[in-house]
Amino acid sequence: MHGLVGEADSPTSRSKYLARGHAWPRDGDVVRTLTQVAQVIGRPAVLLALDDAGAIAVAEHAAELRPHYLIPDQVPGLPRTLADKRLLAQLCSALGVVQPETRLITGERDAAAAVTDFGLPLVAKWAQPWLLPAGIGLRNTSLVRRANQVPRLLQHVEGRDLLFQRFVPGGPHSDWFFHGYFDENSHCLYGGAGRKERAYPKGAGLTTYGRWLPNPVVEGTARELAAKLGYRGVLDIDFRHDSSRDAYHLLDFNPRLGAQFRLFSDSSGLDLVRAAHLHLSGRRTVRGRAGHGRTYAVENYDLLTAGPRSLRALCSADELAWLSADDPRPFVAMARQAMKRGFTRLARQRA
């Protein structure tokens, strides 16, 4: 396996399964870099995007990449539309997909009106998170609980699309996600629904502890939407159940592989990556028994979310994000990195 890695010392670069890591192009020429990687590999390889920017680049340059890689025949502009949260909101409105009410914020007047109409808390999202510069302390999605949090967001709004969404109150068991792989006819060859048990940050963040469970409504909604869009390839969609309406709001649509894809590993060992590899290389996908009840935990973030309560989950989880008995080095690198960041943060606070 080859991969484009953001940093040479990233935990993923330590995996024994990574034959070679390649640096992201600083000039942004992803096609040239991927072509060079293909020459190193020496034969057609399945290409999977792990972030939105990668998914957009692969879809929009598919004609140039297809001689070197096995990739889904995706509608070229579709991943950009789905990853851009402003365009996604417009698409949901056009298709009648249930979603939280969304406003584009261009300045203080828009922000004040949204706070008045939506109330607090509300959800703030940067429409194109892959364009956010590193090191300025902005999260892709954040929960605005107090009015005095708004000015800091507005400091960075020039040249960027900031969205405010009405907050959908979520109780226990209200957050769900769907991961699936869709063929050239937008038929789901493999997929499943998972329930987000814990997240970081709480209420509007990544899954730190999740469980594979059947949910016909979430599964049906995701499959129906993919069919309407003519979607092909891997996707990851987030939903929140609104008990007041008994409806599932679509919160996010990631046109690429989701971080917790290994949660959905069935009795035969099939998962989303293997399903994609089999299909794109012209082989049949034979599904085993669904692993309903399987759990997945992200060690470092679940500790931040649940503290000591997370230890039981980490000990019993069927799938861990970092630790693997046959490949422990990524976990060790992650732990070192987390401790280094913690000590750095502590030193700054004491300075």
Residue ranges and their predicted role:
Residues 1-74, 109-112, 339-351:
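ATP-binding N-terminal substructure of ATP-dependent carboxylate-amine bond-forming enzymes
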Residues 79-163, 168, 172, 184-187, ...:
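Active-site nucleotide/adenylate-binding loops and adjacent lid/helix of ATP-dependent enzymes
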Residues 197-209, 254-269:
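Glycine-rich phosphate/pyrophosphate-binding beta-alpha loops
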Residues 227-262:
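Conserved metal-phosphate-binding beta-hairpin within the catalytic cores
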Residues 275-351:
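Peripheral (often C-terminal) accessory segments that flank ATP-dependent C-N-forming ligase machineries
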